[in-house]
Amino acid sequence: MGETLDLVDDNRFTLTLRSTSEAVRQTLSLITTHFAGLISETELATLELVLAETLNNVVEHATPEREQGQASLHIMPQRGGLACTVRDNGLPMPDGQLPPKRLPRVDTIIQDLPEGGFGWPLICMFVQELDYRREGGVNILYFLLPFTQKRDS
């Protein structure tokens, strides 16, 4: 998969991967294994969904047809949730900004229903503190995935 994995003692997760669908699948499997037992099953499923959408967006939109496409992922547990940072060397977001959070229109005939456009609004439904910037040719997306269940202090 061409990745570099760094698991440290405080349950942080850091990984560098090629921007391919196969690498995304393998990354999601590693994340599921790493965080199983550390967060609830619901939180784990949400983390996997949000990261699948995020990383697949990198593969499909930021690094299409780029053999050197690369992404890195850093997940840091903190009070109240998981702080996630995704970096990639792909194309910038359109107009250098986050896309709109709205869902595509579905009040149309079946033949005219959109095939895509649901991933980004889905991400926005589950995360907080969503931030995007581009520095030195690198896209940096940050978000907090809040815990949905109470924790013992």
Regions found by a protein language model. Give the residues of each.
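Conserved beta-strand-loop-beta-strand hairpin that lines the nucleotide-binding pocket
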Residues: 1-14, 59-153
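Helix-loop-beta hinge of the Bergerat
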Residues: 8-42
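Bulky hydrophobic/aromatic packing residues
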Residues: 25-28, 47, 54, 66, ...
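Conserved short strand/loop->alpha-helix "switch" segment adjacent to the catalytic nucleotide/phosphoryl-transfer site
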Residues: 28-52, 56, 112-113
